[in-house]
Amino acid sequence: MEEEEWSEEQQRFSYLQRLKAAVHYTVGCLCEEVASDKDMQFSKQTIAAISEVTFGQCENFAKDLEMFARHAKRSTINTEDVKLLARRSHSLLKYITEKNEDIAQLNLEKKAKKKKKLEDENRNSVESAEAGVEESEN
């Protein structure tokens, strides 16, 4: 039993380290991009510090999103939870809202196409069935 717990703990630690490495890599890439645009440099310590702060903020975001969903008696986080999280940053909230509306519009268009396709298929199958009935009557 203890060995299982230790193995799970080790897997969790390994997963956490991979996540931290991914955040560190992404922060490093963004810092390189900013450095080339602004003609400046970031030290490795600065990149590491930004990475740590970013990872910590992501952990806080995840906990907040879970709490928002739980408060609404849901087990799934939805866009309303994300909007609530972003409420203090007006530009971010605006961006998220616009993207959400774009996605909703695309979903409506897909639904309409699917409905039209089903109606066309139903119409074709009814027409072919009627044609078959006419042939058998003759």
UniProtKB/Swiss-Prot annotation:
It is found in: Nucleus; Chromosome, Centromere; Chromosome, Centromere, Kinetochore. It comes from the Eukaryota. One of its GO terms (biological process) is resolution of meiotic recombination intermediates. The keyword Cell cycle applies. This is Centromere protein S. GO terms for molecular function: chromatin binding; DNA binding; protein heterodimerization activity. Gene3D superfamilies: Histone, subunit A (1.10.20.10). GO terms for cellular component: FANCM-MHF complex; Fanconi anaemia nuclear complex; kinetochore. The modification N-acetylmethionine is found at residue 1. DNA-binding component of the Fanconi anemia (FA) core complex. Required for the normal activation of the FA pathway, leading to monoubiquitination of the FANCI-FANCD2 complex in response to DNA damage, cellular resistance to DNA cross-linking drugs, and prevention of chromosomal breakage. In complex with CENPX (MHF heterodimer), crucial cofactor for FANCM in both binding and ATP-dependent remodeling of DNA. Stabilizes FANCM. In complex with CENPX and FANCM (but not other FANC proteins), rapidly recruited to blocked forks and promotes gene conversion at blocked replication forks. Keywords: Acetylation, Cell cycle, Cell division, Centromere, Chromosome, DNA damage, DNA repair, DNA-binding, Kinetochore, Mitosis, Nucleus. The gene is CENPS. The keyword Nucleotidyltransferase does not apply. Belongs to the TAF9 family. CENP-S/MHF1 subfamily.
